[in-house]
Amino acid sequence: MRRKITFLLTFLVAVLSIALVGGKVYADTGYEVEDYANQDFCYVNQDTGYEAVIVDDAFLLSVSEKSMLLEKMKLITTYGNVMFNSISYNSTSTESYIKSLYREKYGSESGTIFVIDMDNRNIWIHSNGAINRTINKAYAETITDNVYTYASDADYYICAMKVYEQEYTLLQGRKIAQPMKYISNALLAVVIAV
C-alpha cells in the first residue's frame, strides 16, 4: 500500500512539474511561448485607409519584434496595404499560397505581402495594384535575394525589417542594392565577349 501511495505521489509531482515548468520553444529562437502574443498586430492609416498587418502563425517573432516591425510597415501604408505572414504548414507552393492570401485579404487593392513559409523553407513577396508598378516581380526577387541570408540564419525579424526598408526605399523613388543583377550582367558580358 505504501508503494502505491509513493508511486502516485511521485507521478503527481512529475505531472505537475511538467505542466508548471514546461514551455515550448518555437523556431529555434530561444523565446518561450509567453513571449509571443496569439494576436495579430494591425494598424490602419487614417489618411489612406490602407492597413499594416502582422500574422505570425509560425511564432517566429517576439512581441517586441512585432511592435518594431509594425513601425517599419506603417510607412508603406501611404502607398498601399502591407502584410507580414509566417506559416508553419503549407499544402501548396509558397507562390500559390501568397497569391491566394492576397486575393482573399485585399482583392485588387494596392498592397504587398511578405511571407516566410517554414514548411517549404521559402520567403516570398507578392505585390498588386499601384505598389506592383514599383515593387514588381523582378524587384521582389531582388529583395528576397538581398535578405535570404537572414532567414537562413533564423534572424526572422531582421529579414522582415530589411524587406520593408527596401520596399519603402523603392516606393520613395530611390534605388536599392542589386548585387545579383550586376554579377549576372558581368558574367553575361564576359560570355558574350568570348
Region spans (language model):
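A structural boundary signal for the start of the first folded domain, especially the loop/turn
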Residues: 2-194
